[in-house]
């Protein structure tokens, strides 16, 4: 197991950067929707000697010797993932959600095939068809988006699907604050003879806890990350039925298709994460993520902020700042000066460039892990409001509110 003291002795420059990052995490309110704080057990697994072991292949079928013990770790992760999400197949080797998505695309499609995915500018993800990503480079992408109220228009999705006849429809998002109807997506996919892939990276923890409709009964294949609302190590995973996975060789699409050796220390951390999520306490945690998000959304609305779709059903919200006469880039910067961390984000029909944006995305998974409750959301909203409306006048007052909360809820 690693010791931070060893790092300080051998590489004080790097140790300084880690120390400063620990301080930042402790002293800032973390509102990036895709970030969370892992448990000490998850962190310990990632710093374990399992990082030393090469294990190309799968449990019982490795290309290296000496894998009998890392096989135990991977099998634990697989069985726990299947139990957690109620499926018969799980591949826990993807290094990221993006690589899980890539593996599924290459397993089900040929270059040039048509794919429908949510428009990145409307809340989708790079890997759902952005032209700068592999998905937009190798495949013919037909995007769908949200209506003028910020909701997915399923009738419009069906209309587009009938017109373009995709081979694959991707459901899921990175900046969509409402529940997604996976059953409706499957009906549309069946109507046009398409596969349905659900990327539940952002909502996996909410699905596991029963607070969002599970895609497992409806999707041909589901991908996810293991961090975000699931609160595990940074990594990816593919879920499906054993029959579909075998027919389409999903395992081979990960190894040797898109990856070499798996990261056994991360897979061990995934196993711990899944065990944590199977505990009854995780359901309570996920419920608090949603209640905190709802409370924060209400408090921000009361202070004049414009929320895309008017609110949230999950862990995140998208704030359109055009009525505040400030860009997303500017808001991200000045909030960071007040020790509030968030990210700039495009809003539907955004007139600004993706490097500037007209909005910010906020999420509650990390602050909920820390212990923040619904009453605290009024303080968080007030700090945000003070900074966005007049940073020069109000920054110190906002920082004092932030310090009051971070002192009340120490991180580690």
From Swiss-Prot:
Its cofactor is pyridoxal 5'-phosphate. Its main location: cytoplasm. SUPFAM superfamilies: PLP-dependent transferases (SSF53383). GO terms for biological process: glycine biosynthetic process from serine; tetrahydrofolate interconversion. It comes from the Bacteria. One of its GO terms (molecular function) is pyridoxal phosphate binding. Keywords: Amino-acid biosynthesis, Cytoplasm, One-carbon metabolism, Pyridoxal phosphate, Transferase. InterPro entries: PyrdxlP-dep_Trfase, PyrdxlP-dep_Trfase_major, PyrdxlP-dep_Trfase_small, Ser_HO-MeTrfase, Ser_HO-MeTrfase-like, Ser_HO-MeTrfase_PLP_BS, SHMT-like_dom. It catalyses: (6R)-5,10-methylene-5,6,7,8-tetrahydrofolate + glycine + H2O = (6S)-5,6,7,8-tetrahydrofolate + L-serine. The record marks 227 as: Plays an important role in substrate specificity. Its EC number is 2.1.2.1. (6S)-5,6,7,8-tetrahydrofolate binds at residues 120, 124-126, 353-355. The keyword Amino-acid biosynthesis applies. GO terms for cellular component: cytosol. Pathway: One-carbon metabolism; tetrahydrofolate interconversion; Amino-acid biosynthesis; glycine biosynthesis; glycine from L-serine: step 1/1. Homodimer. NCBIfam families: PRK00011.1 (NF000586). Catalyzes the reversible interconversion of serine and glycine with tetrahydrofolate (THF) serving as the one-carbon carrier. This reaction serves as the major source of one-carbon groups required for the biosynthesis of purines, thymidylate, methionine, and other important biomolecules. Also exhibits THF-independent aldolase activity toward beta-hydroxyamino acids, producing glycine and aldehydes, via a retro-aldol mechanism. Belongs to the SHMT family. This is Serine hydroxymethyltransferase. It comes from Lachnoclostridium phytofermentans (strain ATCC 700394 / DSM 18823 / ISDg).
